[in-house]
Curated annotation (Swiss-Prot):
GO biological process, one term: symbiont-mediated suppression of host cytoplasmic pattern recognition receptor signaling pathway via inhibition of IRF3 activity
Source organism, top-level taxon: Viruses
Keyword Coiled coil carried by entry: no
Induction summary: Expressed in the late phase of the viral replicative cycle.
TM helices/strands, residue ranges: none
Role of this protein: Plays a role in the inhibition of host innate immune system by acting as a negatively regulator of type I interferon production. Mechanistically, interacts with and prevents host IRF3 nuclear localization to inhibit its transcriptional activity.
Family statement: Belongs to the asfivirus E301R family.
Keyword Isomerase: no
SUPFAM superfamilies named in the record: DNA clamp
Species per Swiss-Prot/TrEMBL record: African swine fever virus (isolate Warthog/Namibia/Wart80/1980) (ASFV)
Protein name: Uncharacterized protein E301R
Subunit structure and binding partners: Interacts with host IRF3.
Keywords assigned by UniProt, alphabetized: Host-virus interaction, Inhibition of host innate immune response by virus, Inhibition of host IRF3 by virus, Inhibition of host RLR pathway by virus, Late protein, Viral immunoevasion
Length: 301
């Protein structure tokens, strides 16, 4: 600041000191002896955003699978056409421990109210499930500025597993993802605008790409009425990649209503879109240690 410009009245803002949290990853033993699950993470707002996404999709119940290496959240949207699978790898958090593979069922509305009260003053979330209280999941939020801990005890259940939902995890296996013939990236704003605009005219849109170095093409045509073509000519600007042979055409028809609702629900800025030959679509996004996948099935639209 120049010497001839005087600071206004009042004290200068106090600079916040953020603790340096070490990310130790997966532990061989829990910090608390009674813990079946311990999860400590220095980015609580990631969970808040995840449950905002579940709320936007009007998901009801959420299945939580804990394994010795990761924690995964499974749910469906209200239309039952889209399946959400969100995974956090234990090696990417401050510390993680799970004794074995087990499932918990939680009510989205109940947990959502808890996360609504969490703001940036909380720098760490700890989730604990104990052997002596199997019906309870503990959420501990820590504000280091004033040395405050807020603990919520949420009732959980041993859920009835939704096998169709769990089966969707095969769609996002590392081996399966390598074989998707078409993928590109949109910002959430681009995705929302494209499908919102299209919804004014048609229920279905065609996604098409020729083999080789050709544009991504979205279009619809109503005979004797109106047609529309949206071309993405620079593949690098949307990170467009494909494995379509030069002599072939990749083409699928997608129901706009489902994609429009997903676009409106998104909580990340960047979305990776993958198309399968049978018309299934996968929407991928990342939030720090969280990988968020939403699968929309063509045979359900």
């Amino acid at each position: 600041m120049s010497e001839d410009i005087r600071r206004g009245p009042g004290r200068p803002p106090k600079k916040r000191v953020v603790p340096n949290f070490e990310r130790k990853g997966i532990l061989e033993k829990p910090v608390r002896p009674q813990s079946r699950l311990e999860f400590s993470y220095d980015n609580p707002l990631i969970f808040k955003n995840l449950f905002i996404y579940f709320k936007n999709l009007k998901s009801k119940n959420i299945l939580v699978r804990c394994t010795p290496t990761e924690i995964t959240f499974f749910s469906r949207d209200q239309s039952q056409a889209s399946f959400v699978i969100a995974t956090i790898d234990g090696k990417n958090v401050n510390h993680y421990y799970a004794s074995d593979v087990f499932w918990l069922g939680i009510n989205r509305e109940l947990v959502e109210k808890m996360f609504n009260s969490i703001d940036r003053s909380f720098l760490k979330i700890t989730i604990v499930h104990r052997y002596d209280k199997p019906e309870t999941l503990f959420f501990i939020f820590t504000d280091f500025d004033i040395d405050k801990e807020c603990t919520y005890q949420i009732t959980v259940s041993e859920p009835e597993l939704d096998m169709d939902l769990i089966e969707m995890e095969k769609s996002i296996s590392e081996e399966r993802l390598k074989n998707y013939p078409l993928r590109w990236e949109f910002t959430s704003k681009q995705l929302k605008k494209t499908f919102s605009d299209l919804s004014n005219y048609t229920e279905l849109v065609t996604i098409e790409k020729l083999g080789g170095d050709t544009p991504l093409h979205l279009y619809f045509q109503k005979f004797n009425s109106i047609s529309y073509h949206e071309m993405y000519k620079s593949s690098n600007k949307i990170n467009l990649t494909s494995t379509i042979p030069k002599s072939q055409v990749f083409q699928i028809n997608v129901k706009i209503a489902h994609i429009k609702s997903l676009a409106s629900a998104m909580v990340t800025d960047k979305i990776r879109i993958l198309c399968e030959e049978n018309g299934n679509l996968i929407f991928q996004s990342e939030m720090d240690a969280l990988m968020l996948n939403t699968i929309t099935l063509n045979n359900m639209i």
